[in-house]
Amino acid sequence: MDRPHSRGAPPSYSNYDEDPDELRLGPAGNPAAVRLLPASSFDEEIPETRHSRPTHRAYQPSVSSIHSRPSSISNIPSMPPPTESYVSYRETGSPTRPWTPSHVGRSSDEYRRAPPSSVHYERADLNGSPRPGTPSSRYGGSPRRPLPPAPLFAGPGARSSAFADDATVSIPLSDVDDPFGPGSADLGEARGHRGSYAAQSQVTLNEDDDEGSHLRESDIGYDEADAVDEKSAAHYGPAPAEGDQQRRGVREPQKSRKEVQLINGELVLETKIPTILYSFLPRRDADEFTHMRYTAVTCDPDDFVERGYKLRQNIGVTARETELFVCVTMYNENEYDFTRTMHAVMKNISHFCRRSKSRTWGENGWQKIVVCIVSDGREKIHPRTLDALAAMGVYQHGIAKNYVNQKAVQAHVYEYTTQVSLDADLKFKGAEKGIVPCQMLFCLKERNQRKLNSHRWFFNAFGKALNPNVCILLDVGTRPGGNSLYHLWKAFDTDSNVAGACGEIKAMKGRLGQNLLNPLVASQNFEYKMSNILDKPLESVFGYITVLPGALSAYRYHALQNDANGHGPLSQYFKGETLHGQHADVFTANMYLAEDRILCWELVAKRDERWVLKYVKGCTGETDVPDTVPEFISQRRRWLNGAFFAAIYSLVHFRQLWATDHTVARKVLLHIEFVYQLLQVLFTFFSLANFYLTFYFVAGGLADPLIDPFGNRIGLYIFTILRYTLILLICAQFILSLGNRPQGAKKPYFASMVIYGIVMVYTTFAAFYIVIRQLTDPKAKLEMGNNVFTNLIVSMASTIGLYFLMSFIYLDPWHMFTSSIQYFMLLPSYLCTLQVYAFCNTHDVTWGTKGDNVMKTDLGGAVGKGSTVELEMPSEQLDIDSGYDEALRNLRDRIEVPKSGDSEAQMQEDYYKSVRTYMVVSWMIANGILGMAVSEIYSDRTISENYYLRFILWSVASLALFRALGSTTFAIINAVNIAVEGRVRLSLKLPTWLGGSRGSKSAISSSVGSGTSIFTGLGEKITATLRRR
């Protein structure tokens, strides 16, 4: 039965039945042959005494499963053929339907088809094959069940069985398609002649080792479980004893053995997408929309191109230049985190396509963007995330293999150009919501080898194959703004000296800011905001941002490349992946915990180059922050250790700047920044002692009977209790950090943070009381000099006042009112709990991937000789559709996946622990000596006479003023750029006789580029002047 072609169907589907034994494999122009395995008995004559066996409604013709047992019915003795009066046996549970399609065309009203129902049900068949029946349908129930909700952009035909248009796949009925009709007994013979979108059944004929009998096509898909008697049909039987049970109505995929031609000795397959997805696609005019491409990569990522692997953007009609390459790394995040990020990325791609006046982008701008998703470990990925990828058409279950010709597969690469997206609520969005096609590349790594290895696949394997201009790095869970990716790309387009850029990372506050009710989330919100207002703009003015966060950052691919000798930013960046044991000292190992900081330094200090890093204010991204104490401590451990040791590395190697091609002005600015960083490192190292001394002198001021606000020496008692409590708590913090994980000591860590908060509240109360008493005391003189007013009031007011001032300048002051109190209350925990735990765990430099080097075999393999391999694949289109249907149902029902327990902590090397001990002892002794010495020297002096407290307060105020000056400079430069760009755009709109430059679009990039390079141009002028002299 030939299927009528719909108007929108691509040629590949309409001509699919010309060769039923051919499967599309590999790129265009190099098709791979797929043929049936020969069987010695294929040409033997089939005995005439063997009659067709009647089948019941659950009968499903398909290929022979290699997992099913041989049918014992096929070995029964020969029986004479039935007479004309023979009536086929029909099970009592199968109703007689006089309007079955087999009787269509009869004149009697008895055989007329019933009118269509108004309730939307699934068809009884799919692509000419029966729907997988549920247990109830096997024993007489209706096989029809309500359809899942169709995508919003599906046409009427996709949402109603009563309509059909060019967006639907027409699946006509025939006598042989009805499992209830009398012609169903001859399904095996008729099935081979049907024509539809689905691939024809592939049959493997093999000799039976036991009896020497041969499989017939009518035997395919039939086993002993299909022979159901009346007694078993009465009920479902006893409940399953144990183990996972398959969902009712889900068809178990059938597989057949096929011979597949290898491409350059590697396994590359192209399979059709599921029918449901195909039915509502807006575009079906190319293979990239109708076929998914799978590649089993058996080499190291560094050898990807050399081994001859190619991506779709390198071959055939899809060969394109890549301007923007987006990397999304994930580990075990759930489907909500993934869809939140992926849907935001697709909306950003739509923004590129809406820029119709751009010389680079436009309606087909999506062809210049490739989104690469790298998952760290096949056994670590969340099952529902795989379902989300399958719903988008990027992933299909049952295709991947563990090995190809005894070579272990290192990564599974899936390529597909999807036209649908899933939002954070798991709802389909398509062209009606502005979603454009998106070229997706899904790399599922076989083993868990951490994030750095995922970036090596991205840069050294796929990046080398595509050679993009700009690479953007994202973490799953981060939601970029609607035009954030465009602003990141624009920073590289307007300034050719920019090698890296980052945006503003925001803490996800939830609906109506409800997450801010958690003090931990509120404190991180304040920290992120002040970093984006003070730190990032300051470093951007200097040209060196110490860290471009991996959650939202971008790099120029050309700037990352190594030199001819193999030395450069990428070689240093990936050096941390091979550091193990005593081959790397603790300093280097901890430094590469923040390898992105090393990459930033290597870019700025690259020999004979003048690369700079830039902060893009218009680029924003929301990310979920830790909301529990154990998760928060574990995250900050790696951040603090990596930042501390990476800062020391850059300070020690600052002389590399002298070999760069930076201007004199830029080098002067960078040296000023290094002095600032040196002070920051020193304050970080002595932060424990400085906090204790601040508490000792400020809170101890209330112990003076002349100042005591409570009287009766109560202030002295409170101070004494809190002082010894703080000392004991710091000692207990060392014990906790050395012997317990945060996940195993939640209550002690939480209690310590509460006590630190109480200490901070009392210290803040003491400071405000002293300030108010000083202001209201008529004997006190409010004048600048060596007094309490100058040392305490002015220094503290300037620090907090600068925070408010800069927040208002950037028009973002709300965090000062909603999150500042929580941050200052948790500030002692930042200085003590986090810092102590980080230094006490400098030995912890592993990522928990030891022992994960055994080749898995659960997916099967591709085995053969020469350039031909034999492998198992889904045999019918129905198998592909069933997997897609199950993925949609899993997403709709939101089935929870059991969470695996924490794995046992791996033993660390004695070398790391011994060095950790020496470092912790040195750090503890240094802070102890400073605290005891200063407290003894100034124990009997007032605040106005305490020079160390004065130094601490004014140092904090000075650093805050320095950051505010840099932030203000950045704001001025940003305002100038906006003004210049606005003026140029206005001049383009004006005619020439009014002073405009209509038609000269090149003026935009040149003018804006000059505006963003103020300091670069100034430095070049100074350098030229010095050379002339």
Curated annotation (Swiss-Prot):
Pfam families per the UniProt record, alphabetical: Chitin_synth_1 (PF01644), Chitin_synth_1N (PF08407)
Positions annotated with a glycan in the UniProt record: 348
Basic and acidic residues compositional bias, start-end: 244-257
UniProt entry tagged with the keyword Transferase: yes
Stretches with biased composition (Low complexity): 61-77
Function text: Polymerizes chitin, a structural polymer of the cell wall and septum, by transferring the sugar moiety of UDP-GlcNAc to the non-reducing end of the growing chitin polymer. Plays an important role in cell wall integrity and has distinct functions in invasive hyphae and vegetative hyphae, but is not involved in plant infection.
Name by which UniProt lists this protein: Chitin synthase 2
Organism listed in the record: Pyricularia oryzae (strain 70-15 / ATCC MYA-4617 / FGSC 8958)
This protein's encoding gene: CHS2
